[in-house]
Amino acid sequence: MQQFEWIHAAWLAVAIVLEIIANVFLKFSDGFRRKVYGILSLAAVLGAFSALSQAVKGIDLSVAYALWGGFGIAATIAAGWVLFGQRLNNKGWAGLILLVAGMVLIKLA
């Protein structure tokens, strides 16, 4: 395991935020019919992967990727609820709980 440094955690946080922004812009793009939002989404994805590449310099890839994906999904669910009124059904909540449990297990491994 690599030695933890806060700068790598900060890069991971930036990657997560950019992934959420990319997903929101993708929704606003309406299937790339609204080109500006589509381009902004692509730029945010590029930024997210760039930030993730910096994060994995100090965080194991398996941990960084699991946290990036898991937090990105959970926060995108929250953004969908707040911005678009989207709701999870019981199966969706179960999936989210399993996702969070998986992230915890990977971090503890």
Curated annotation (Swiss-Prot):
BP GO annotations: glycine betaine transport
Keywords assigned: Cell inner membrane, Cell membrane, Membrane, Transmembrane, Transmembrane helix, Transport
Subcellular location: Cell inner membrane
Transmembrane segments: 6-26, 36-56, 64-84, 88-108
Recorded family membership: Belongs to the drug/metabolite transporter (DMT) superfamily. Small multidrug resistance (SMR) (TC 2.A.7.1) family. MdtI subfamily.
Organism of origin: Klebsiella pneumoniae (strain 342)
Key word Transmembrane helix present: yes
Xref: InterPro entries: Small_drug/metabolite_transptr, Small_multidrug_res, Spermidine_export_MdtI
Designated gene of the protein: mdtI
Name recorded for this polypeptide: Spermidine export protein MdtI
Topological type in the membrane: Multi-pass membrane protein
Pfam families (alphabetical): Multi_Drug_Res
Quaternary organization: Forms a complex with MdtJ.
Disulfide bonds: none
One of the record's GO molecular function terms: spermidine transmembrane transporter activity
GO cellular component, one term: plasma membrane
Biological role stated in the UniProt entry: Catalyzes the excretion of spermidine.
The keyword Glycoprotein belongs to this UniProt entry's keyword annotation: no
